[in-house]
């Protein structure tokens, strides 16, 4: 598929980006009132209502043993809006046991990239910390993190998360 975008900020920027599904043949089915595999139901958008504008997008695929999280947040120094203040991190586990409700992950920071451009010389992705994503239910989770490097080095904490939007069918 393809993502087409157009900014309305007067810059005239628009374009399209080819998309490729990272995990093929994802299927979900239900059996009675509960999903046959609750792991898929944990995928979605999560946030802390007290920190609007920040959160996680999580994709859990037990069929391929894959978990991916994108964390959008701000610099720990309280830098204002814009490039200097925004932070995007990704997180992946070294291994994942389907059915696990607590998932240890490595946090990665990518720097040097350019929007809607192929990989550029100097762009790099490095491990900058660790996190644990623990699901209490289909609607509540915690994100505990520690940064050991990168632009947020020394920061740590735990964030109580709520699901954005309705619960998947069969989730409680």
Task: Map each language-model feature to its residues.
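Mature soluble binding/inhibitory domains
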Residues: 2-172
